[in-house]
Swiss-Prot record:
Residue ranges crossing the lipid bilayer per the database entry: 32-52, 85-105, 116-136, 154-174
Result of altering D343S: Abolishes endonuclease activity
Mitochondrial intermembrane topological domain: 53-84, 137-153
Role summary: This protein is responsible for splicing and maturation of cytochrome b mRNA. Specifically, it may be responsible for the splicing specificity of the second intron.
GO-annotated cellular components: mitochondrial inner membrane; mitochondrion
A single BP term in Gene Ontology: RNA splicing
Family: In the N-terminal section; belongs to the cytochrome b family. In the C-terminal section; belongs to the LAGLIDADG endonuclease family.
Additional comment: Encoded from partially processed COB mRNA that terminates with the in-frame coding sequence of the second intron.
Protein name: Cytochrome b mRNA maturase bI2
Amino acid sequence: MAFRKSNVYLSLVNSYIIDSPQPSSINYWWNMGSLLGLCLVIQIVTGIFMAMHYSSNIELAFSSVEHIMRDVHNGYILRYLHANGASFFFMVMFMHMAKGLYYGSYRSPRVTLWNVGVIIFILTIATAFLGYCCVYGQMSHWGNMNIASNMFNMMKTIYMMMLMLLIYIFYTIMMRQMMKTKEYTMLIKSMDYINKNKYMINLNMTNKKDMNNNIGPLNMNILSIIYGSMLGDGHAEKRKGGKGTRIVFQQEYCNINYLYYLHSLLANLGYCNTNLPLIKTRLGKKGKIRQYLKFNTWTYDSFNMIYSEWYIKNMSGKGNIKVIPKSLDNYLTPLALAIWIMDDGCKLGKGLKFTTNCFSYKDVQYLTYLLHNKYNIKSTITKGNKENTQFVIYVWKESMPILTKIVSPYIIPSMKYKLGNYL
């Protein structure tokens, strides 16, 4: 192993600068974060040096500012850097927030990260406001005594008004609406539905494992692709020594266009090499030679949590059993649903079917519950064989228009036949 990777300190530099796995779809908007760090360093350094010469005494404040401008070596540069650096700080911060809004960084699984950013933004505003309260800094003594106090009083007033508004909305309007006949009927129906499905809901709520804090370099796109494929023929491989996990994708030769599409998605996100998967052969049933394609992602430590979610120990023998993770409701996005259809779906009459070979009946029940609860897609379950090792999910033809509308933006041309005449 190279010294830059084995050394404790150099490995940090290596992982962030040299071998940093960045997706190829990244653009210049991602420079805003580092520019914010640069602005912060400038503000801290210039602020510390100016604080060495500034006096907050009302009789000395103005003189100390003039002292910084005239007597301190390059003091005027420090003052102008600090004043204009604050303006650039907020300009870059607003651009950083605009980038996050444009790319949907506030959505799951980045909700917590966005909330922390909002808190940092509010603290930055408060810190900058304290700078304006410095005597004879950027504000006169009169402004300091009057405007500052008025600002704080206004904040208290806004807080009380928002609190009263929230109380009015949540306790008045919603309670009135609840008593209307239509909403009341919907509530009774919802309670009846929950009563009938309380086992599945309880299983979901009690066993759900939150993965949002363990994602690492992942994002919703890569998780949607992986989870959608894992519902079909994809699987996760834990590397020897527990040093990481890779995701393996495999398809028959007849689905070559779909596998190339899947490979291009992952390659563009930077999770696998750009070489096209090669055609391989294997011995099928009755000695028939079958052609297939296969590729895998790089090995990542952050994929370990995906493995732990999808696999449990086999109590009756060696190896692990593939299961449906209880956190799937967070990641069964339209993209994941489209990947599952292209990976494992099959047109049947005016409907669609999914054949599951790895999951138990309870897992398949949970899948149908998610389809109905998340997208209002109705389906039924039947046994695929006598050994109860295979179950088939049939999507009703009444739900096909809904399903088609959800997944159509992600279905490639060679797979549109699976949706029949609805597309």
